């Protein structure tokens, strides 16, 4: 996408010049053009304060999330997934976003969210389970995966399910596997599925 506009224009011109009746080709190219136009038309929220503008991939993730709420971004590490996830949450106007991540990066998520959208409120730790929905705020509940395999996890998950969660971000989803808690025989993955 580095040369996005140039590529787009070349594809558009090539489509006009092409006399092919190949439906697959027409659909494939048509989808590319439609999605590219949708991404380019995306307006950043006024509250966006991150020093760098999002790249085309990050905008594409936000665009696709708006089109397909179950869209998942499995890009490589370092590709800007955090920015794309936070941006997507605002593009869809999520008032309560649940971020599930490893314990080691809970604070980092909070810092990143504040850097991108300073008007955000974030909560982590046990305070998450007493949050009230407030449509005047953008709230991010940052929960580490370890909270999903504790004795009280099921009761906490039920509290979260009653809260209107608009968007869920699963960071480093491989951490959701966990090991079953021997005493309760409840795994992170099982509790995660109950939450979703």
Predicted regions and their residues:
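Charged, low-complexity intrinsically disordered regions
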Residues: 1-35
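SF2 helicase/translocase NTPase motor core
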Residues: 31-70, 78-195
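Hydrophobic anchor at the beta1->P-loop junction of P-loop NTPases
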Residues: 73
